C-alpha cells in the first residue's frame, strides 16, 4: 500500500478492517471468505491487484474469478516454501512444487500457497505473476526473527552467535519486495519469479554486527561452531532465527536461484539499512513487536544460551 501511495497511485484495499486513518486510500470492507462480499467489485476496474493471501485457496479462487474481467494484472505474493522439500541449492522456478488444490479448504502453509497460485493462474493466465518470496525481513515483520535478534542484542551481555560468521544469507526486505512487485506489474513480467537477494548479499556476521551496532553495541558476540550447536540440541531457525548451518537439509532456503527477479529489476538495500529501520520500528512500538498468532515465538531461552556458552568455553579450555 505504501509503495503504491509513494507513486501517487490510486490505492484501494479490500479486507475486514474497513476504515483506516489514511484518507488517501479507498477502503472496501468485506470478507473474501464470503462470496457475496465480492459483489463490492461490481462495476469497478483496476490496473493491478496485489494479493498476499495465505489461507484457504478457495478464497483466492473466488477473488481472482471475480476480478478476472475487472483487473489488468494480478500479482500473488507466494513463497519459496511451495517447492517440494528439501529446497535445492541453486533451485530455480522450474523445481517441482508441493501438491495443491485451488478448491482446498485447509492444509499446510506450502500447499495452501500452491493452491492459491493455481487458482489465480486459472483465472488470469498470462496476466498473472507469482512472486515466490524468500525469507522476508524488515520493519513490521510479524514472524519475529529479526526483531528477536535485535532485542537479544539490546539486552546486552555475551551472545551465542551461530557460525560461521561468513555464512551466506538470502532474504528480501519487504519494502524492496513491494517496490519490485509494482515495477514488475507495470512492465508485463508474468509467470513465476523467486524474489530474494542473491545468496551472500549478507552474511550471518554482517547481520549480527549490524544488530549489535544499532542497539548500542553493549553485547559481545561469541561465535560457536555449528557442530557444537547441534550437539547441544539447539535448533536452527526456531531457536536461532534466520540461521541454518552449512550442512543443513534445508540450506537451500538461503541459496535459491533468483536471477529472473534480478533481471526484472529487483534491487536489494544493504543489510545495515534493513536492520536499522527494523530497530527504529521496534523501538517505536515500545520494543514489543507483534507476532502472528499461528507462529511459535522464535528465539533461544536465556538460561539455555548461558549454559551453552559456558560449556563451549569449557570445551575450548580443555581442547
Locations of the language-model features?
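N-terminal Rossmann NAD(P)H-binding glycine-rich loop of SDR-like oxidoreductase domains
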Residues: 1-9
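N-terminal Rossmann-fold cofactor-binding loop
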Residues: 13-18, 31-32
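SDR active-site strand-loop-helix element
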Residues: 14, 52, 77-79, 131-133
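Conserved Rossmann-fold cofactor-binding substructure of NAD(P)-dependent oxidoreductases
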Residues: 25-48, 55-65
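Conserved Rossmann-fold NAD(P)-dependent oxidoreductase catalytic core, especially the SDR/UDP-sugar
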Residues: 61-114, 122-123, 129
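Conserved beta-loop-beta element that borders a ligand/cofactor-binding pocket
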Residues: 116-140
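Mid/C-terminal beta-alpha module of Rossmann-like enzyme folds, strongest
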Residues: 183-259, 277-279, 286-319
Amino acid at each position: 500500500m505504501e509503495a503504491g501511495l509513494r507513486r501517487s497511485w490510486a490505492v484501494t484495499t479490500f479486507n475486514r478492517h474497513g476504515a483506516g486513518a489514511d484518507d488517501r486510500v479507498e477502503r472496501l470492507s468485506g470478507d473474501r471468505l464470503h462470496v457475496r462480499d465480492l459483489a463490492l467489485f461490481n462495476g469497478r476496474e483496476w490496473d493491478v491487484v496485489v494479493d498476499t493471501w495465505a489461507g484457504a485457496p478457495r478464497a483466492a479462487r473466488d477473488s481472482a474469478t471475480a476480478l478476472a474481467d475487472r483487473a489488468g494484472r494480478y500479482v500473488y505474493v507466494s513463497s519459496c516454501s511451495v517447492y517440494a522439500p528439501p529446497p535445492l541449492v541453486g533451485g530455480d522456478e522450474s523445481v517441482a512444487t508441493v501438491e495443491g488444490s485451488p478448491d482446498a479448504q485447509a492444509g499446510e502453509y506450502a500447499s495452501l500457497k500452491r493452491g492459491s497460485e493455481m487458482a489465480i493462474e486459472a483465472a488470469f493466465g498470462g496476466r498473472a505473476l507469482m512472486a515466490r518470496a524468500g525469507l522476508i525481513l524488515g520493519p513490521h515483520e510479524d514472524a519475529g526473527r529479526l526483531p528477536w535478534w535485535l532485542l537479544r542484542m539490546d539486552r546486552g551481555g555475551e551472545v551465542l552467535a551461530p557460525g560461521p560468521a561468513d555464512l551466506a544469507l538470502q532474504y528480501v526486505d519487504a519494502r524492496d519486495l513491494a517496490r519490485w512487485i509494482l515495477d514488475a506489474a507495470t512492465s508485463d513480467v508474468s509467470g513465476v519469479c523467486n524474489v530474494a537477494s542473491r545468496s551472500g548479499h549478507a552474511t550471518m556476521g554482517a547481520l549480527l554486527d549490524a544488530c549489535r551496532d544499532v542497539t548500542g553495541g553493549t553485547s559481545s558476540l561469541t561465535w560457536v561452531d555449528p557442530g557444537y550447536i547441534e550437539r547441544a540440541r539447539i535448533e536452527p531457525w526456531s531457536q536461532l532465527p534466520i540461521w541454518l548451518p552449512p550442512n543443513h537439509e534445508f540450506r537451500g532456503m538461503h541459496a535459491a536461484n533468483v536471477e529472473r527477479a534480478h533481471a526484472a529489476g529487483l534491487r536489494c538495500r544493504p543489510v545495515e539499512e534493513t536492520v536499522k529501520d527494523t530497530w527504529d520500528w521496534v523501538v517505536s512500538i515500545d520494543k514489543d513487536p507483534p507476532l502472528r498468532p499461528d507462529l511459535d515465538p522464535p528465539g533461544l531461552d536465556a538460561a539455555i544460551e548461558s549454559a551453552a556458552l559456558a560449556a563451549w568455553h569449557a570445551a575450548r579450555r580443555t581442547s
